[in-house]
Swiss-Prot record:
Function: Controls sex differentiation and the formation of male appendages, spermatogenesis, pigmentation, and male specific behavior.
InterPro entries the record matches: AGH
GO cellular component, one term: extracellular region
A Pfam entry, by short name: AGH
An example Gene Ontology biological process: sex differentiation
Transmembrane stretches, start-end: none
Positions annotated as glycosylated: N133
Molecular functions per Gene Ontology: hormone activity
Places the protein is found: Secreted
Protein name: Androgenic gland hormone
Expression sites (tissue/organ): Androgenic gland.
């Protein structure tokens, strides 16, 4: 019985570990799984893309001035002061072009507006992935040079 409890506890701890989203160097954050499209909108505005677009609610991070350090090792450290780390350029997978044929991933863009797709194309291009409520969501982040 104790062995079974130990195995279940170990399995729970393994599955419950924290997964960080891909970030611009020196940044780390959790993905806001419930509202990825709004997060992309916030990030595009923060990066100065589509600055005329008005947000209907505040962006999900309280203090956009503070950033984590530029040390890459810092990306994997835990920190109690999480409220200052915010997402960068999150999105869903794009259609991949292969020769003259376009291959769609499991998420279709037919239901998305042209403006949503424009946000995605403007802000995102480096691929990684993150587990969002047991669903893999692909994230993209363009590195902007100052």
């Amino acid at each position: 019985m104790k062995g079974l409890l130990f195995i279940i506890s170990l399995l729970f701890l393994t599955l419950h570990q924290r997964v960080w989203a891909y970030q611009v160097e020196g940044m780390k954050s959790d993905v806001i799984c419930a509202d990825i499209r709004f997060t992309v909108h916030c990030i595009c505005n923060e990066l100065g893309r589509f600055p005329t677009a008005r947000l209907t609610k505040p962006c999900p991070w309280p203090n956009r001035e503070r950033r984590s350090t530029d040390d890459e090792d810092y990306l994997f450290e835990e920190d109690e002061d999480e409220e200052f780390f915010h997402p960068r350029a999150l999105s869903r997978p794009t259609a991949a072009k292969y020769d003259d044929e376009i291959l769609e991933d499991e998420v279709s863009f037919h239901s998305r507006t042209k403006r949503d797709i424009a946000f995605h194309e403007e802000c995102c291009n480096i691929r990684t992935e993150h587990k969002c409520n047991r669903t893999t969501v692909e994230l993209y982040c363009r590195r902007y040079s100052p």
